[in-house]
């Protein structure tokens, strides 16, 4: 009864907030209307779709928004509402999949992404439904099946018998029912593969059994799905980082406190922090497992001096000076949370990570600024004050934070770069990620941004197209961007492509014996470019304008 009241309360809240404009049902009758609508849907699914009463009720009682939308289609009257519902359902069949997907825990705003195309009734395709019934029959909470579906849809294309057989094989390894459910919810792909367990999944469950036995010897588990799910999700963090490393499993057995004292979010944040060093995921995981004290380090708030931090890690003064000369835009102050990218921006990430993993992880916690004014730069402070007083303060501060995140320090160079980059912090991050994913190393991207900040003003697809053209049609490598970073700032269709193709045509036809660099071809002003063509032959500019400079004709030139 208590659970029913909770469901009613949840639906009533949705009803009153989202449906405020429709006020067809008086407040005192909302619970009544919801109950009758749930009962009508239950009867509809049970009688017309031949679902078991239990399954029909599960769908009806867990689809709050769909129920609300149904109620809003009818005029409410206490004596006739049940009859109105039945009549409406007779003439206006519901999209049964919509109710189903919401009921298994998928947020209603996302349901449309999962609806099968041109199918409304379970009778048209029972595959997903039958898989859900098999999972539910084993004991999976109905409203948690949506998590499984979103992460691993292949689970739901298997036959019920295959699912049941697979689940029983997990129990044969020595797992209780709730342990199987919690583990599979945490690692959904373990449910894929039919009735037989592959060697990888069997090996995983054997290792998990050993780990859980070690945990349970201290009576650390409550015998319910949520308890097993919570611990399994934490274990999955390390499993995803290096599932084949035997040392990792041994360390997990020895460091039970990691999974009991710290939240999943805390573990993910720490793992993510060390992954940002650009090292292997396995190394990041092992650093935490070998040194669990790291979990107590504050790696977010402390302010650092880049110079001071490098010396703290053992760099000599001459080494620091050399780094500062090559990467001046990284120096000044920053925050410890940005340290991994700061080190990648100066190509010292692997060296410093090796120092940390070789027994010096404590250096992250022992660093402090020498004095309150250490590494404060006046030009930066003045620029920051201007930002604080600007009308677009929030927008600019977010962009500045992005630059600090990728390694730019609190210095005048960073402020100059900031003046030239446009877009939201999210957009800047996406554009930066495109460059990184293309294969340009982190430190070189930062150098490119320092030299040509407007690189970050290009849309992701534009950056991809220009890089593809550079490496494909132009036949050059990404390294050329170090010579000519502004290449990415020019228009591909109206500048880069037509000029390059015209130059290529001139060489092929024998009009020009000189081979110009990409920078010379692209960056030369229009006036100088035309003058160069005229110098080759007075008739060449006319040919350029008629056959190459127009977007309509440039792709048809032979």
Swiss-Prot record:
The protein's name in its UniProt record: Transcription termination factor MTEF18, mitochondrial
Consequences of knocking out this gene: Severe growth and developmental retardation. Dwarf plants.
Family to which the UniProt record says this protein belongs: Belongs to the mTERF family.
Transit peptide boundaries: 1-58
GO MF, any single term: double-stranded DNA binding
A biological process from GO: regulation of DNA-templated transcription
Role description: Transcription termination factor involved in the regulation of mitochondrial-encoded gene expression. Essential for normal plant growth and development.
InterPro entries reported for this sequence: MTERF, MTERF_sf
GO cellular component: mitochondrion
Pfam families reported in the protein's UniProt record: mTERF
The keyword Transit peptide is assigned to this record: yes
Effect of residue 105 to D: In shot1-1; short hypocotyl when grown in the dark
Localization (cell): Mitochondrion
SMART domains assigned: Mterf
Keyword terms: Mitochondrion, Transcription, Transcription regulation, Transcription termination, Transit peptide
PANTHER family reported in the protein's UniProt record: CGI-12 PROTEIN-RELATED, TRANSCRIPTION TERMINATION FACTOR MTEF18, MITOCHONDRIAL
């Amino acid at each position: 009864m208590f659970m029913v009241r909770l469901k009613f309360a949840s639906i009533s809240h949705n009803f009153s907030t989202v449906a405020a404009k429709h006020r067809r049902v008086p407040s005192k009758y909302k619970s009544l209307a919801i109950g009758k609508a749930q009962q009508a849907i239950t009867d509809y699914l049970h009688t017309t779709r031949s679902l078991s009463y239990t399954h029909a009720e599960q769908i009806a009682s867990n689809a709050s928004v769909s129920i609300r939308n149904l109620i809003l289609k009818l005029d409410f009257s206490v004596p006739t509402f049940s009859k109105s519902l039945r009549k409406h359902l007779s003439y206006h069949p519901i999209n049964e999949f919509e109710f189903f997907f919401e009921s298994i825990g998928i947020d209603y705003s996302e349901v449309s992404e999962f609806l099968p195309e041109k199918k409304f009734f379970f009778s048209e395709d029972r595959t997903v439904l039958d898989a859900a019934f098999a999972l539910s029959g084993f004991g999976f909470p109905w409203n948690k099946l949506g998590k499984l579906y979103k992460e691993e849809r292949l689970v739901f294309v298997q036959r019920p018998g295959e699912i049941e057989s697979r689940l029983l094989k997990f129990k044969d390894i020595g797992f209780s029912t709730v342990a199987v459910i919690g583990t599979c919810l945490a690692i959904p792909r373990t449910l894929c593969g039919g009735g037989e367990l592959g060697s990888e999944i069997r090996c995983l469950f054997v290792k998990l059994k050993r780990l859980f036995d070690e945990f349970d010897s201290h009576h650390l588990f409550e015998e319910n799905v949520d308890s097993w799910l919570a611990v399994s999700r934490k274990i999955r963090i390390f499993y995803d980082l290096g599932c084949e490393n035997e040392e990792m499993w041994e360390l997990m057995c020895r460091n039970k406190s990691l999974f009991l004292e710290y939240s999943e979010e805390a573990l993910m944040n720490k793992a993510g922090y060390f992954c940002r060093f650009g090292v292997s995921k396995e190394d990041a995981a092992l650093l935490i497992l070998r040194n669990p004290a790291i979990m107590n380090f504050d790696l977010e708030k402390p302010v650092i001096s880049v110079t001071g931090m490098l010396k703290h890690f053992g760099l000599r003064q001459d080494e620091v000076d050399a780094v500062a000369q090559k990467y001046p835009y990284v120096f000044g102050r920053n925050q410890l949370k940005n340290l991994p990218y700061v080190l990648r921006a100066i190509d010292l990430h692997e060296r410093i990570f090796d120092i940390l993993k070789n027994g010096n992880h404590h250096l992250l916690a022992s660093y402090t600024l020498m004095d309150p004014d250490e590494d404060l730069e006046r030009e930066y402070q003045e620029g920051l004050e201007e930002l604080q007083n600007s009308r677009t303060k929030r927008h600019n501060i977010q962009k500045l934070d992005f630059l600090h995140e990728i390694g730019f320090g609190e210095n005048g160079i960073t402020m100059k770069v900031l003046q030239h980059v446009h877009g939201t912090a999210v957009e800047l991050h996406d554009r930066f990620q495109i460059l990184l994913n293309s294969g340009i190393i982190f430190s070189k991207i930062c150098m490119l941004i320092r030299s040509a900040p407007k690189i970050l003003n290009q849309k992701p697809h534009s950056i991809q197209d220009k890089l593809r053209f550079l490496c494909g049609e132009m036949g050059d490598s990404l390294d050329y961007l170090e010579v000519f970073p502004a290449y990415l700032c020019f228009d591909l269709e109206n500048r880069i492509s037509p000029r390059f193709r015209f130059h290529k045509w001139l060489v092929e036809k024998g009009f020009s014996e000189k081979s110009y660099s990409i920078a010379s071809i692209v960056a030369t002003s229009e006036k100088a470019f035309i003058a160069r063509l005229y110098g080759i032959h007075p008739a060449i500019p006319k040919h350029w304008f008629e056959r190459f400079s127009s977007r309509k004709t440039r792709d048809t030139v032979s």
